[in-house]
Amino acid sequence: MLLLATLARAQQAPQKKDEQAPPEEDEALVPKEYSFNPLQASKELKVGNYYFKQGKYRAASLRFLEATRWDGTLVEAFLRLGEAREKQHDRKGAAEAYAKYLELAPDAKDAADVKKRLAKIKK
């Protein structure tokens, strides 16, 4: 009898649920927004250099790409991105990275060497 009374009361009382509105879109699918952050770019560059030295060129190129997104003027990241993509036999990607490097630093010490690499890739 006591059990029936408890069940009846439970049915009568409205239950409050933790109602959360579902997200309007999957946050994993939302593109990441980048703002100028030279510290994060420097970190990504360091990690990319580590991966490059380990021979993990795909991981390195992803880190160098992240560095260029955080700081679009970080010329070393574009150079290293070109080198990593070249190691992966991604000629188009390497050419794009080298071209951007030369656009940002046309008077760099190694600009002539990068121009030679770029010409070799485009052949």
Where do the model's predicted regions map?
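Canonical tetratricopeptide repeat
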Residues: 80, 113-117
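Alpha-helical segment of the N-proximal tetratricopeptide repeat
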Residues: 37-70
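Helix-start (N-cap) detector for alpha-helical repeat units in TPR-like alpha-solenoids
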Residues: 41, 75-76, 109
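Long, contiguous interaction/recruitment modules in multidomain scaffold/adaptor proteins
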Residues: 1-37
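TPR/TPR-like (Sel1-like) alpha-helical repeat modules
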Residues: 89-109, 116
